[in-house]
Amino acid sequence: GNEGSGKTLFTKKLKTLFENQSDPKLCTIFEQFNVKKSLTEIKSWFSKNGSKISEKKEVGIIELSNIENIDDFLLNLSKQESDIKISIVNLMPVGNSYEYLMKNMPQKRFENEYLALTKLDLCDLSIVEIAAFVELNHKCMFFSGVRSSEEGLYFAKVGETADHIVQTMESRIG
């Protein structure tokens, strides 16, 4: 996510979510991303925790500030650790116009790439935003909207999203 999208708070919320689920996971957050430094840290972490990671008992969360770095990062990481499984969660605060999203948000490029909508405590998700995400082929995985790192991260569910759309339309019609 871009600056101001809520990356740092989201990573803390994601860590809390992983650590408090029915099958808890230990989490390590890699902040202040720097390709060379972070790859060294991740390789060291992976070497120390390889068995826990492969047993899905430990998870690493890497905070990237610029999506342009992701291709180089993924290439370098896969060269160093071919067994590592990666999912990408792009963050986008709500409250953007359709035109802004179409111009500034890249198309989904990877099978394991998802979307988290942030700042839902500050602004409502609009129908035009949903349309842009659909056109850009993004799958929404999380909604985030409370400033506390202990709460406010929810899995995006079709029924709840559909209810939100219906409520929004009814409030505008009625």
Predicted regions and their residues:
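NTP-binding/hydrolysis catalytic cores, primarily Walker-type P-loop NTPases
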Residues: 133-174
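Post-Walker A helix-loop "phosphate-sensing" segment adjacent to the P-loop in P-loop NTPases
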Residues: 16-28
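Hydrophobic positions on the alpha1 helix immediately C-terminal to the Walker A/P-loop
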Residues: 10, 14
